[in-house]
Amino acid sequence: VIEKYDLKIKGKANTGLALCGDEYKIRLFILENIYEQLYLNFPLGQIIREKLYDFQERLSMDALGFGFFYRFFVVMIQRMESGHTIKKLEPKYEELYGSSAYMIVDEFLNEIEQVKGYKISKEERLFLSISVAGMRTPANTAEIEQKISISEGVADLIIEILDRIKAELNVTVVANELFDDFVYHVFFMINRLKYGFHIYNPMVDDFKNKYSVAYKMAEIAKGVLEERVGIEMTEDEM
């Protein structure tokens, strides 16, 4: 499993093993594979927990979206406090700087600094921003629309996807009140794929078998996104 993260295990079983590689990729490996084993009951302290729940309320996050953010936060704090900080990130992550997701996280981490008594670097702020920019889409996007802004290009992508579905399947998907929800869904998904965070979907095979037309539509959407955005879409995201 660790090979796909470009990581290596060094040391010996009787003297201690260490995971070696890029710090960002180490964190992704932890988040996607062994979070529960390492951090299920991680002691954050009452004040930090209250600030986290205040953040959830301010952003109107549902349980899924908040769980996503919470995990990133716990991993960030533990890694930082054990001396494993992110020193450098690829240029694509810098694009988050100044985004609405970054500004939301920036304000929150300023509060955390006051509690913790140490500074949290821009690189760490960018790391946590990924959990907001790529959150699981809330059940109700009405509240999130006030805080997270998306580019017009995403809506254009959706329209192109609907046009392609009409052309290839002769199925008309009406852009109704669910359109905004779908725009945010695609926006968050693109960010997850762009920044390398993978979500496991146990329903893939079931979805393929029970909803073949919908799956075909998802395949068409995949083609448009890969062609226009230049990202590889995983089957789990479909």
Language-model region placement:
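A cross-family "folded-core" feature that marks the main globular domain of proteins
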Residues: V1-M238
